[in-house]
Structures are given as C-alpha cells and as structure tokens.
Amino acid sequence: MIILKKKLAGVSEQSLSLFLTRARKAAGVRGQVQVLVTSSDELRGLNRRFRRKDKATDVLSFPAIVDGEAGDIAISSDIASEYAYELGHSLDEELRILILHGVLHLAGHDHERDKGEMEALESELRDKLKLPSSLIERTTKPAKKAAKRKKR
C-alpha cells in the first residue's frame, strides 16, 4: 500500500503500488509492505526517534514484527524531488528507486555493513525493473550538488 501525504505531480498511488508488488517479488519479499511518502521534517523525526540521527534522510525501512507483514518504508518526497531534479529523471522514477532500496532493506540487506552485496543486487534489480541508476551508486552526488545550490 502506498500513502502519499500530499499530491505529487506525475505520481500515482496506483502505479507505485503496482511497482511495489513487482519490487517485492523481484527481491523475494513476502508479506505486506506499506510505503509512506511524506516530508523531510517527518523523516527527520522518524530518523531521530528510531536511529538516533537528528537529520532528514531519503528513505527509512522498518521490518515488521507482525506475521504476514514485511514492514514499512518511509520516503521523503522533498529529498526524492531534489534527487530527481539533479539526476534528470522524474519524481515517479526516483520514488521507485527509493521503494526498491527500502524493499531490499526489508529483505535483510544492509549496504552499510555488507561488502557490496546489496549494491550489486540493487543494480541487478534496477536493470530488471527498468530503473535509472541505483541509490547506492549515486548517494553522495545529488546531496553535494543540492548543498552547493543552497549556498548560492
């Protein structure tokens, strides 16, 4: 299930829900996944509460503790919009990239601890699902460009 906190131009809950189903199957994730697309402020609050990091982030994943559910994913529409602009693709595509990234975390992958396994799998699934470059491959580039733009 996809929950958009606000209307986003060119983004359809139904289309993202269909993609979520494809991403879950591709990653081997069973059970329901809920995706909340919301503000950077809300992601910052979630990040502070659950990871003790007082900063906004693009995507967070929360594995489920209830049978029949895989977990929840929260995505910042603000950061996704910045990434999409910087990388020259649509917001819808960026949300799909972030959904795939979150689903891989729900499947138990962790790019902060593994030795490139998640990056390789994300790249493979990105190609299979016809998405632009993966989140892991490009994480620092958009953030640096956005920071430069804000300083001007």
UniProtKB/Swiss-Prot annotation:
The keyword rRNA-binding does not apply. It is found in: Cytoplasm. SUPFAM superfamilies: Metalloproteases ('zincins'), catalytic domain. Keywords: Cytoplasm, Endonuclease, Hydrolase, Metal-binding, Nuclease, Ribosome biogenesis, rRNA processing, Zinc. Zn(2+) binds at residues 101, 105, 111. Coiled coil: none annotated. Its EC number is 3.1.-.-. Its cofactor is Zn(2+). Residues 132-152 are annotated as: Disordered. Residues 141-152 have a biased composition (Basic residues). Belongs to the endoribonuclease YbeY family. Single strand-specific metallo-endoribonuclease involved in late-stage 70S ribosome quality control and in maturation of the 3' terminus of the 16S rRNA. This is Endoribonuclease YbeY. It comes from Koribacter versatilis (strain Ellin345).
